[in-house]
Structure formats: C-alpha cells, structure tokens
Amino acid sequence: MASLKSIIRQGKQTRSDLKTLRNTGKVPAIVYGYGTKNTSVKVDEVEFIKVIREVGRNGVIELGVGSKTIKVMVSDYQFDPLKNQITHIDFLAINMTEERTVEVPVQLVGEAVGTKEGGVVEQPLFNLEVTATPDNIPESIEVDISELEINDSLSVEDIKVSGDFTIENEASDSIVTVVPPTEEPTEEEIEAMEGEAATEEPEVVGEEKEDESGEDQKEE
C-alpha cells in the first residue's frame, strides 16, 4: 500500500485557477465515498504517477487529506493526450471489508508453440471483471499461452488463478486463441486470377453505328 499527500483546495476555483494549478505540476482532484465528505484537493502529478505504477490501477492508496489519512482507490481520472497531462482525479474512499467489482487486465505469459508454425495470437478479451475486497484485488491476471498450438484457445474456465477473488465473466468467454496463418496465393493462382480479370475489348457502339451509316450511304 502506497502513500500520497494531498492539499485541500479552499473555495470555488475558476477555469483559469485550475489551468494555473495544472501548469505548476498539480492535479485537481476530489475525494468522496465511505466515511468522508466530498473534499476538493490537489496532488502532485509526478508523485501520483509513481504511486499508480507501484500499486496498479486498482491498488489501495493511503491518501493524506488535512490531518487525516484515508484509504482510497482511483475511481476515475481524465488525461489530456495533447498536453500529456492528467487533468483531474476522482479518489473513492473505501471500506476495506466491502467487496468491489473492477476490471483487471489480462497479461499473456510465454510464447505460443503455434506461432513458430506461423500462427497468430489473437486476444479478444483484455480485461476480466473481478470481485474482491480492495486488498485482494489482483494487479493483473496472468494467462500462460506457451502450450497453445494453431487453432487452440483458452477461455475463462481454462485459466488457473490463485487468490481470494471471483471472476465474474462467463466461463465460455474466449480470452486468447492462435489462428492459422493467412496463406498467400501461389504463382499459378495469381496468374489464374489475372487471366479471369483480363477481358476482351468492349464493343464500341459509336463506331458500329458509323460503319452501318456508311454502308447505308453506299447502298443509296
């Protein structure tokens, strides 16, 4: 569990105030939830990033708010890709004994045997829905794909996990599969396709009419 300090923001702030705040390396945030009143705070962006890298997206953070320390999770945050800047954070105060359902990323481990034969690994499911108390939520769920051959797949029911949490996805939900390589056409097939595409010159209707008209004039 990592710690992060915050400073309470007093009064109502304008857009200009928030812009100035962000330009000094601080991120406006709000704390709400279990056992606490909605409180506007600011945190250091660099320190926040360090904490998230340490505990993960669903990790528990001990957030200093005034004279109190509150256990929180990041409920949501906004990021500006143009400025490469976190613009706002929602901290949710939590009850450590109350279960929550969150999305946990799937991490593929190993190299599928089938890829050595040209197979391609496809992953239709990148996150799993997990229910657990905050301190039992895994940072990620590892799925070993090293034994997968071409046309093999793994579903939720196939993965082996350890920990005090429940995966809420359907057992049949596909996580990963190894598909056969796309076969490129042979030279003979390419020539055949080119032959089919080649057509005779279309009949020019205008020219025919001119010829027919000329013949009529000669007959006259």
From Swiss-Prot:
Record GO biological process: translation
Provide the Gene Ontology terms for cellular component.
Answer: cytosolic large ribosomal subunit
**Carries keyword Cell cycle?**
no
Q: Does the keyword Ribonucleoprotein apply?
A: yes
Q: What spans are recorded as compositionally biased (Acidic residues)?
A: 184-220
Read off the InterPro entries from this record: Rbsml_bL25/Gln-tRNA_synth_N, Ribosomal_bL25/Gln-tRNA_synth, Ribosomal_bL25_b-dom, Ribosomal_bL25_C, Ribosomal_bL25_long, Ribosomal_L25_dom, Ribosomal_uL5_bac-type
Alphabetic keyword roster: Ribonucleoprotein, Ribosomal protein, RNA-binding, rRNA-binding
Q: Where is this region: Disordered?
A: 179-220
One function term, GO molecular function aspect: 5S rRNA binding
Q: Name one Pfam family in it.
A: Ribosomal_TL5_C
Superkingdom of origin organism? Bacteria
Q: How does it assemble?
A: Part of the 50S ribosomal subunit; part of the 5S rRNA/L5/L18/L25 subcomplex. Contacts the 5S rRNA. Binds to the 5S rRNA independently of L5 and L18.
Similarity section:
Belongs to the bacterial ribosomal protein bL25 family. CTC subfamily.
What is the protein's known function?
Answer: This is one of the proteins that binds to the 5S RNA in the ribosome where it forms part of the central protuberance.
Give the protein's recorded name. Large ribosomal subunit protein bL25
Lineage, broadest ranks: Bacteria, Bacillati, Bacillota, Bacilli, Bacillales
